[in-house]
Amino acid sequence: LLKTRMKNGLANFISCILPASMILFAGACTKPSPDYIEVSWGDGELVFESIGGEREISVTALQNWLVSVSGDEDSAEWCRITPIAGLAGSAQLTLTVDSYEGEAERMCVLTFVCANQKKEVEVRQTGTDGDAYVYFSDLEFKKMILDEYDSDKDRKLSSEEALQVVRLEFHDTDISSLKGIEKMGNLEYLDCSYNKISGELNLHDLKKLRVAQLHHNLYSSLDVSGCSALDTLIANDNYSYNDAGYMEFPLEEVNLSACTSLTKADFTDNNLTSLDCSDCVSLTDLNCRYNRLSFLDISGCDRLVRLSCRTNAGLSGELDLSHCPDLEYLECYETAFEKLNTNGCSVLKYVYAHNSSLSEVDFSSNKALVHLDIYNNKIPALDVRNNIELTYLDASLNRIQEIDLSRDTELVELLLGYNSVSELDLSGHEKLVRLTANSNALTRIDVSGCTMLENLNVDGNQLTSL
């Protein structure tokens, strides 16, 4: 019975092993359990170009197995796999596909059989008219797209059908590759967050893409260069846990070249060491905190309103924001910046620049400033006479020797501990609630008229009276 169902190669194989293994093989193929068999070949589909080629296929089975090729009458000639049978255990097979001169795609099926288990694997080869269809690397992604956009129900996505895709949104799947998405040239909205997309994520062919929600995945590089319509890019929190339970952050490279319409970008919690936003001339909101940046180029980002580059220990030198007149919110703390230039930022309201290496700051042109947090730096002098809207100032742990606060009567909280200030006049600051000026060199302090003061700490000074 076996010989009548197999071709010559398989018959020869069986004639050699039949005397020794007839009982074992027959028993294995009739038992309903265990009948486990696993077939793998890496990522994606088994798709060959017209030039042909070879692919390695791995088989793991608990019993003896067979594989056959089916399809058109010539499929066994142009698509061959060796060996075609094996015993229980693991084996490496070689799939060979010949070159092809036809225009239309051709296909065959590999059928793996062991006991009651049967697995079919599709093998496809593109013709010379290979651009007629879209080829996917991820079978789950392919199925999702075909279920929605395969209008002629041929279980293939033509280039014309691909252009019907305008919006894609999917979460919590095992999809690991978006290969094939490059043919969806009319795609405007993509939300593939909370998936397992890995390797290189290339979206540079999507010229109409406006929104890309790509966060919580596993890709190592992101290319959106040339996406001139892209307005919103969210690519934060791409991480996984290794076997030891520690977090790993794979995203190391982002290409934003020619993203001239981009207004919002978020790269929080990744592994970036360099970020060039110089082409992003429309950018208003940039978040690149919690990376390993040592290079950040925002020289062309004149429209910035919010910037968070905090917790990047490699960022040093000068942070020059003098070309950002619309800047309102700045987080640059836990960096190694030595100079902060906010000249011309006339609407800047919130500055968080603590735990850094700042030794030079000038806030004289930031007249709208209401919150200034610069503690634990190396600042020797601080002029806030023009910052009359200030309600919160923390300049603790610096090297300040004198400070004039006579015009800053809106202050509610003032923290100046661990400096070298010798005199402090806060008379008439009726809104002041909290004052911390411990561990300075104070010999005189005036808090007369501070009728709202609730918390006062001037320990560790040289005061003889209060």
Model-derived segments and spans:
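Canonical leucine-rich repeat
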Residues: L178-I181, E200-L201, L222-V224, D243, ...
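Bacterial Sec-dependent N-terminal signal peptides
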Residues: I23-V47, A115-F136
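Conserved hydrophobic beta-strand positions in leucine-rich repeat
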Residues: V166-L168, L190-C192, R210-L214, D231-A235, ...
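LRR N-terminal entry segment and analogous cap-like coil->beta motifs
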Residues: K153-L201, D205-L206, R210
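Leucine-rich repeat
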Residues: M184-L187, D205-L209, C227-L230, E248, ...
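A short beta-strand micro-motif common to beta-rich folds, especially ectodomain repeats
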Residues: L93, E103-N116
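Surface-exposed binding patches on compact interaction domains or structured appendages
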Residues: Y36, A61-T94
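Consensus "Asn ladder" position of solenoid repeat domains
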Residues: T173, N195, N217, N238, ...
